A protein has these predicted regions:
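ABC-type nucleotide-binding domain
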Residues: 1-215
């Protein structure tokens, strides 16, 4: 796992969107599997990357159809298995129409946390080799955070994982943590090393711990 952290507005989400191919770089290059992203068809990039953000868009269609967008050929059983793995199956089944519930424009009939879990289910169904999580637990309440973290762990087994996190406690075990400041890489290392060598990261960690203590 590679984690991107930094102050608000430092450029973390911009990096994630560049990696996902949403924008083109104006200098330098981004490679995926040894190939420059700018030379790859958008359809191929989309097949290789699952992008789960804090603002996941859902279409005004059924929950089943929204999850199935991850892999249009998936069976109903596969859709429901992905929902179970992401921790939203029980929630869906409590709805009057279950998986056939229409979510409303942009998923407006669901809470932010419910939309995120459906987006994670869609990513699980897609099973792409590269997973980008852009503050994917931003709307998850503390009671369900452990469940969603377990779902994310299942989603990312054997995959290249890039995480942008606002809760630093979720990325302390990352193989590499990249501290982004003012659009540049300020420092990068493990959690323990950054606590020793990077004042900015240390301040962010102390602020995070202080906020948790006040909850």
């Amino acid at each position: 796992m590679t984690a991107l952290v930094g102050p608000s507005g430092s450029g973390k989400s911009t990096v994630a969107k560049l990696i996902a191919g949403y924008w083109d770089v104006t200098s330098g290059s981004i490679t995926l599997g040894g190939h420059e992203l700018k030379d790859m068809p958008l359809s191929e990039i989309a097949d290789q990357i699952s992008y789960v953000s804090q603002d996941n868009y859902l279409f005004n269609r059924s929950i089943r159809e929204n999850i199935r967008m991850g892999r249009p050929s998936a069976t109903d059983a596969e859709v429901e298995q992905a929902a179970k793995q992401s921790g939203c199956d029980a929630i869906i089944r409590k709805l009057d129409n279950g998986y056939d519930t229409v979510v409303g424009s942009a998923g407006s009939h669901l809470s932010g946390g419910e939309r995120q879990r459906i987006a994670i289910a869609r990513a699980m169904l897609k099973n792409a080799p590269v997973v980008i999580l852009d503050e994917a637990t931003a709307y998850i309440d503390p009671e369900n955070e452990a469940l969603v973290q377990k779902a994310i762990s299942t989603l990312t087994v054997g995959k290249t994982l890039i995480v942008i996190a606002h809760r630093l406690s979720t990325i302390v075990g990352a193989d590499n943590i990249v501290v982004v400041k003012d659009g540049t890489i300020h420092a990068q290392s493990t959690h323990e090393k950054l606590l020793e060598t990077c004042p900015l990261y240390r301040d962010m960690w102390q602020a995070h711990i202080g906020a948790k203590d006040q909850m």
